[in-house]
């Protein structure tokens, strides 16, 4: 792969990091919302759904990190 095409992956990483930041913002908002619920509502189906989404967003962030690491290690740094 030539340097120009390989260099474009830096833009891909920037886009992924930006998306990760957005997901983190949404995650933090949802976590704050969940934390402000009374204990009884946290244990309700609504609270459980919120927890499910929080877990999914944490997984999403982890997957983005995996992709960024893969691109950096296997594509950008490969000679």
What is each stretch, according to the model?
Residues 1-79:
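Long, low-complexity or tandemly repetitive, helically biased scaffold regions used
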């Amino acid at each position: 792969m030539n340097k120009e095409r390989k260099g474009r992956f830096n833009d891909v990483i920037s886009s992924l990091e930006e998306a990760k930041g957005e997901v983190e913002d949404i995650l933090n908002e949802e976590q704050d919302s969940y934390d402000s619920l009374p204990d009884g509502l946290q244990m309700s189906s609504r609270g459980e759904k919120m927890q499910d989404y929080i877990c999914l967003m944490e997984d999403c962030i982890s997957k983005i990190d995996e992709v960024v690491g893969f691109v950096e290690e296997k594509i950008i740094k490969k000679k």
